């Protein structure tokens, strides 16, 4: 039976299902995906710990296609959110190997703690892989999630929802027009959309890509093997993503608590100002202003491999940031856990 009022999106436009659960969306297929914004009271099926909420589209803007999604009714007002970031699987010659450490440590701990519990979700805030090792050690997202799923997240007793980090971009993408979109192509093909939203219980969650990747070449980075550039980037949001965020939030009541996950922190380390990596002040301000009228907004971020809590300066008491430490610890090179 179709579900009425469910939001669907291509990462730019947003549409709503009719009384029969049907939707229609005209798309320029920029992101080559279509997906569901999870409605409250529902879950989606899981395959190897990955939520099945999206589908890949063709690049032909004139072709039509039908993509159906399964929703499973769930009483998820009471739920558990786990946050993981900076896992950095590299397949380097460590003893034990980092993938083995990840499986025997992080994955097994979650299995022993959460198996049998309902409505558990894990948010991955980026840098699951590590770009310079994609080609050096054959360890990209594809190897982690497709060719060897039993070695990594398969078996987790929770759904593994993700967004990108800077190291999840493909450094073999030549710089130039829309390099940010092109470099995220492997991620979108393997993992799914780079910016997503979901309503779980009475909370609205968003996972956003805040990496503007340009991969310029200065000749200064000797660590990138045969890549086309230096894997460099700025923090920020694509204009079409800012528009999408605004459209998504137009469906959210101002009193609804919001949790926003992304990779790069919004706030500088001492909490005094915006993070310097957001070098475009107007982009940062435009993003923050989208949330200023909501009663309670919490941002969860990674990237620094440190743990900090701070209020967002200039936005009263309704916005806080929780910067989360790295799953990889000291790059998987320490015996301490």
Model feature map: region roles:
Residues 86, 126-127, 165-166, 263, ...:
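Active-site glycine-centered loops adjacent to acidic/histidine catalytic or metal-binding residues
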Residues 3-26:
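Short, acidic Ser/Thr/Gly-rich low-complexity loop/linker segments typical of extracellular
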Residues 41, 52-56, 134-252, 278, ...:
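Extended active-site neighborhood of metal-dependent phosphoesterases/phosphodiesterases
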Residues 24-34:
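Short Pro-Gly-centered beta-turn/loop motif in secreted/extracellular proteins
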Residues 249-274:
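Short acidic, glycine-rich surface-loop motifs adjacent to enzyme active sites
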Residues 210, 261-266, 303-304:
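Short, well-ordered beta-to-alpha junction loops that form the rim of enzyme active sites
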Residues 30, 41-135:
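N-terminal active-site segment of His-dependent metallophosphoesterases
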